């Protein structure tokens, strides 16, 4: 017989509790499933009921984004172009014509593109209206080139929050000396330093340049990798055979003037200079009348030759100059430096997505308008959005 007392509690099986829990769990899962089906049907019915409005809003949003992008990349002539007369809207070149109106330069002593950023870190200086129509009349193609170049820099400055100041190079009595006019670049730099006292860097660009990769910021493209990008000495590339070693040079000092070299020496079509006391002293030395008075009959390239002389002889200047590879901010079209046509260091590469192309010297035996058209079209092609292909295949 069992020794278990008759009045003791028998062990109770938990199967009933498990079954109840399983039913509840199954019910909750089914409830969640039914809720998901319900909300899906509700959403689908709402979308079906409002499909026209949703489609209209989506289309409007798409058009807004597309037009905003087109304003920067596909339309280089916006409000800067105004009609002058009925015969001013056609340019012809080798039998072809374009619809372009005479460009009216929006110059002022303080013409700048900064809008929301009143205290920009980087200021782009664009030299425009060279000669100012004083030395000779400017033709329609020159006005169009000027307008395209200005809009290219405006779009880039707006995109990255930089300031753009457009400097009118009209010949004036300030440069009454027959050779002094070519030194405007130095004087304009000094003026711009005073105009933007809180800026950190200034980027000078000649008019015949085109920013080919507007998505790249200067921080990303240059400043974040400056130590590995720039060359402090002339040992690797010295086209003018300047002295590559002079005493008292300290290459550990910070770089405050970033330039490039081409087949003719220092290239000042695109360069960067820092806002510092060193830079102000350099500009004062560079602007010294003794330089042009003593050497203006010898120096063919004027301010460029003066800078080369200062670099070669002044260790305090050499200590803070860095040389960027030419194609970093100054790539050339095939017609420039023709004697080095096979040297890839000089010429723009579409494959490598070079940042800036400089059509320097295009007015000496080359086609400035043809080159500007080509690189503008190429820039648009390389940077257009995927959806523009539906409209511009």
From Swiss-Prot:
Cellular component GO terms held in the UniProt record: endoplasmic reticulum; endoplasmic reticulum membrane; Golgi membrane; mannan polymerase complex
Keyword list, A-Z: Endoplasmic reticulum, Glycosyltransferase, Golgi apparatus, Membrane, Signal-anchor, Transferase, Transmembrane, Transmembrane helix
InterPro entries in the cross-refs: Glyco_trans_34, Nucleotide-diphossugar_trans
GO function term, MF aspect, one: alpha-1,6-mannosyltransferase activity
Intrachain disulfide bonds: none
UniProt-listed PANTHER family: ALPHA-1,6-MANNOSYLTRANSFERASE MNN10-RELATED (PTHR31306:SF5), ALPHA-1,6-MANNOSYLTRANSFERASE MNN11-RELATED (PTHR31306)
Function: Required for polarized growth and efficient budding.
Protein name: Probable alpha-1,6-mannosyltransferase MNN10
Organism: Saccharomyces cerevisiae (strain ATCC 204508 / S288c) (Baker's yeast)
